[in-house]
């Protein structure tokens, strides 16, 4: 792949074409009452992904992940949602895990308000991602225009990615609000995240608007 000419040597070393082959095994238990906008129940997932080895390719690692989403109905059709995800990537035979396969958080599906979150390289602002990650999301979803399938959401996000550790005292945080619409072309989300701790290098903005077509994370 192409990289910026001002990127660090670590990132430049991964320029060019690479290939990887991986297989994923997932176990999911879903008791939620709706596939798009659930209001009660839980969804638990554990997964293992292996790349390289007999599958060949340039990458050689095993990735472990787990998540738990819980939804609780409240009066007036309000829904409280609590979500947590954790992940770990283990390299094999000393093969460096490519930046594209490491955990880089930020954006509407992890830490809203941030562009990129994760370990940087050489004291620069180049986020190269981590081998461990943890994300927590808390949401309050309120009906807005029931006939049109529109909802309002207020949220709090916390999480980070690290190299070879988890640090609960080092979580990036944001709060925000948005609107969700189950439109004829699918679920639409427009949300603004305000960064509570801007950090030293990872992200200079105070927050950002984000839009996506698809299911909530």
Language model segments and positions:
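C-terminal outer-membrane beta-barrel translocator/porin domains of Gram-negative envelope proteins
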Residues: 1-150, 154-155, 162-165, 203, ...
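An acidic- and aromatic-residue-enriched active-site/binding cleft used to recognize and process polar
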Residues: 51, 159, 193-195
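C-terminal beta-signal and terminal closure region of outer-membrane beta-barrel proteins
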Residues: 166-217
